[in-house]
Amino acid sequence: MSLIKDAQRGLVTEEMKLVAAQEGVTEEFVRKGVAGGHIVIPVSPYRKVKICGIGEGLRTKVNASIGTSSDISDVSVEIEKVRQAELAGADTLMELSTGGDLADIRRQVIAATSLSVGSVPLYQAFIEAAHKKGAVVDMEADDLFRITAEQAKAGTNFMAIHTGINYETMKRLQNQGRHAGLVSRGGAFMTAWMLHNEKENPLYAEFDYLLEIMKEHEVTLSMGNGMRAGAVHDSTDRAAIQELLINAELADKAFNEGVQTIVEGPGHVPIDEIQANVILQKRVTNRKPFYMLGPLVTDIAPGYDDRVAMVGAALSSSYGADFICYVTPAEHLALPTPEEVFEGVISSRIAAHIGDMVKLNKRDDDLEMGHARKALDWDRQYAVAINPKRAKEIRDSRMPADTDGCTMCGDYCAIKIVAKHFNF
């Protein structure tokens, strides 16, 4: 099974038909997008999922990352995070646990959702090595590939694979230096392993073998961003660009083998560099779907990073990013709660919509809201709101004497005043 090969043969699959219906585009548009590597549709032969297209000409999608840590590991809490992410309207999930029984947690998360689920196999491989052998640097390459295959068989739909970290990337990082160091967990694991063992990254060195696993299990490959900046002052540096170029070359190779591929982008980017990052990524990857991690546009707002990321995500989407990884208010501070997961998804959905208003001219809901407000039709306003429940709760908690309006204006509602004298 290969959606790319099917599309290139001219076949419109059921998955492509569903995406076309969801997005309001033609089936041929989706087929051509998949055939050209500009659209991916994560699937799995091992579980039925809610079909979701990601890529050029489609609505910007939002991913919610969940998972335990070595300090907090409660699978029931993670399942509640799944529920909250779904309630908030996430398009996909990533299960990124690093504490507890990792395989069992992932199994339970996958069983609890119909959304496409992504993972980072490298985490489990390194953590198992630490538990069984004493250190993450004692991981065996064979174990990394074994775990990758096991996660694929468990029904994982897409995987972040850190292929772009190699000796050349590390040389760029060493020569340039950084203000905030290396903040990607996968990047840190792999860099430490390479330096300790004096070996090339097996995901890069044995990329052909990795592709065989991806092809066999129809997993969508997400080219991981292990060299992403962890501070705006490190944004768009030589190490990040080197990794992007390597990932772009490998993404082309994956596509030629029939493996659907996404390329991940940076996480901390000042506003004036966002457009350049999107243009560069789209150009060097031949317009493959772009997965932005946030991005955060300033580093001084811990506790409010979901709002900071809204700014970056809205701009990224407007310039052409296809996929946004949410950020919660707990970013840089703690493992998020289910409530913070909900807030993070809502924030990212708002940002994605703002971007799509520009990128795809998707403004019908905003037009409907304008009409509903003019008519003082509160039920219509709630229906079109991105979070109807919250909008209704706020108004209901402070109901006006005149139930047509709200307590913001009371008797002096501009809409009601004008309506008495002017019909337009």
Swiss-Prot record:
Which cofactors does this gene product need? Answer: [4Fe-4S] cluster
UniProt keyword terms in alphabetical order? 4Fe-4S, Iron, Iron-sulfur, Lyase, Metal-binding, S-adenosyl-L-methionine, Thiamine biosynthesis, Zinc
Q: Which organism is it from?
A: Methanosphaerula palustris (strain ATCC BAA-1556 / DSM 19958 / E1-9c)
Q: Which family does it belong to?
A: Belongs to the ThiC family.
Detail which positions bind Zn(2+). H268, H332
Coiled coil feature spans = none
* Positions of substrate binding: M94, Y123, H162, S184, R185, G186, N225, G226, M227, R228, E264, Y291
Cofactor, free-text remark: Binds 1 [4Fe-4S] cluster per subunit. The cluster is coordinated with 3 cysteines and an exchangeable S-adenosyl-L-methionine.
Gene Ontology biological process terms, A to Z: thiamine biosynthetic process; thiamine diphosphate biosynthetic process
Protein encoded by which gene: thiC
Pathway involvement of the protein, from the record: Cofactor biosynthesis; thiamine diphosphate biosynthesis
Q: Which GO terms describe its molecular function?
A: 4 iron, 4 sulfur cluster binding; carbon-carbon lyase activity; zinc ion binding
Task: State a single Pfam family of this protein.
Answer: ThiC_Rad_SAM
What is the E.C. number? 4.1.99.17
**Residues holding [4Fe-4S] cluster:** C406, C409, C413
Question: Has keyword Iron-sulfur?
Answer: yes
Known role: Catalyzes the synthesis of the hydroxymethylpyrimidine phosphate (HMP-P) moiety of thiamine from aminoimidazole ribotide (AIR) in a radical S-adenosyl-L-methionine (SAM)-dependent reaction.
Which reactions is this enzyme annotated as catalysing? 5-amino-1-(5-phospho-beta-D-ribosyl)imidazole + S-adenosyl-L-methionine = 4-amino-2-methyl-5-(phosphooxymethyl)pyrimidine + CO + 5'-deoxyadenosine + formate + L-methionine + 3 H(+)
Q: What class of enzyme is it?
A: lyase
Q: What is this protein called?
A: Phosphomethylpyrimidine synthase
